[in-house]
Regions:
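Forkhead-associated
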Residues: 3-5, 12-87
Length: 88
């Protein structure tokens, strides 16, 4: 099973099992994962499981997404151990 480990600005971690094929991340209520930091857009990102792989997609957020320190455009694969940064 895939899982997402969320670490906030203060170093607190939360483990979220990825049981759905599509998960939205953002500041607005109604997202599967809600992050309340100001640098997170209302609808910031989407995680998609497809054919045994996981992808993250930037939903035209203002502050973007980085995978292993590199800013992505559109959609990018996410592998075990990758570090994803939402916002700046």
């Amino acid at each position: 099973m895939y899982k997402l480990i969320i670490e906030d600005d203060e170093g607190k971690t939360t483990v979220v099992p990825l049981i759905r094929d599509e998960i939205t991340i953002g500041r607005k209520e109604g997202n599967t994962i809600r992050l309340t930091e100001r640098n997170v857009s209302r609808r910031h990102a989407k995680l998609v499981k497809s054919n045994g792989s996981v992808f993250i997609e930037d939903l035209t957020s203002y502050n973007g997404i980085k995978v292993n320190g590199d800013r992505i455009a559109g959609r990018a694969p996410v592998n075990e151990g990758d570090r994803v940064q939402i916002g700046d």
